[in-house]
């Protein structure tokens, strides 16, 4: 038979109890690294326009992780910061930030500058232009970038293992550890939990712009 003889939530209940801290670490690291990366991306796009140094942002995606994670690990060891959740967040930012830049650069620079100029003519400063004009108009790509950032962070294994010194457990590190386990039920539960956070992020990225733009017909098309 392809179907199990009986259905039970025992494995789920046990896994949620055993891997609750890993789930919490995964969510904390993903949200923190994504928030930091979003702030960095917005700051970069607001102050730089096709800078020649921008290519350096994407280096972590082009070179093997192990080639520079070892050096980062040595540096943090000397600073006494190895094995902390802050170190893991920093490592994740190195990979989340480039992906968020990829997602945001096109829409951000394609936005008609006349919107900002119109706001400036009404006395709005740079910060008010950003908060009242650009961010609402770019809510859809921002939400998409955040969802991508969360997914990228959740998937990180080597940065978590190296910079966390094996002391910061996430669902990804636990899933890899359980890959050779004989208990497929627990492995299935952990990998399912691993997919929950990215799925929730993408679902919110779809829903939030729809709700925010429900009374703005011109922006509803952009949200779709």
Task: For every predicted segment, state its role.
Residues 122-124, 136:
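Glycine/proline-centered hinge or cleavage motifs at structural transition points of membrane proteins
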Residues 1-9, 163-172:
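Peri-membrane helix termini and adjoining interfacial loops of integral membrane proteins
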Residues 117-119, 184-189:
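Loop-to-transmembrane helix entry/capping segments in MFS-fold secondary transporters
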Residues 120, 177:
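Alpha-helical residues within the helix-turn-helix
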Residues 5-8, 107-117, 126, 139, ...:
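Transmembrane helix boundary and interhelical loop/hinge segments in multi-pass membrane proteins
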Residues 1, 13-109, 137, 141, ...:
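Membrane-water interface segments at the C-terminal ends of transmembrane alpha-helices
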Residues 111-114, 206-219:
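Membrane-interface capping segments at transmembrane-helix boundaries
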């Amino acid at each position: 038979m392809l179907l199990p003889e009986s259905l039970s939530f025992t494995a789920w209940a046990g896994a949620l109890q055993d891997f609750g801290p890993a789930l919490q670490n995964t969510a904390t690291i993903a949200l923190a690294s994504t928030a930091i990366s979003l702030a960095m991306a917005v700051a970069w796009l607001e102050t730089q326009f096709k800078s020649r140094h921008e290519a350096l942002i994407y280096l972590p995606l082009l070179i093997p992780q192990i080639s520079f994670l070892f050096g980062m690990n040595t540096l943090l060891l000397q600073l006494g910061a190895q094995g902390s959740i802050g170190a893991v967040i920093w490592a994740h930012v190195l990979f989340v930030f480039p992906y968020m830049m990829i997602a945001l650069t096109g829409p951000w620079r394609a936005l008609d500058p006349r919107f900002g100029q119109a706001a400036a003519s009404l006395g709005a400063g740079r910060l008010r232009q950003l908060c009242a004009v650009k961010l609402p108009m770019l809510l859809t790509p921002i939400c998409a970038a955040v969802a991508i950032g969360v997914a990228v962070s959740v998937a990180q294994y080597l940065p978590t293992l190296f910079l966390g010194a094996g002391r910061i457990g996430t669902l990804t590190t636990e899933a890899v550890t359980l890959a050779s386990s004989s208990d497929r039920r627990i492995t299935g539960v952990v990998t399912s939990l691993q997919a929950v956070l990215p799925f929730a992020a993408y679902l919110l990225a779809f829903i939030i712009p729809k709700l925010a733009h429900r009374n703005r017909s011109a922006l509803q098309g952009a949200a779709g």
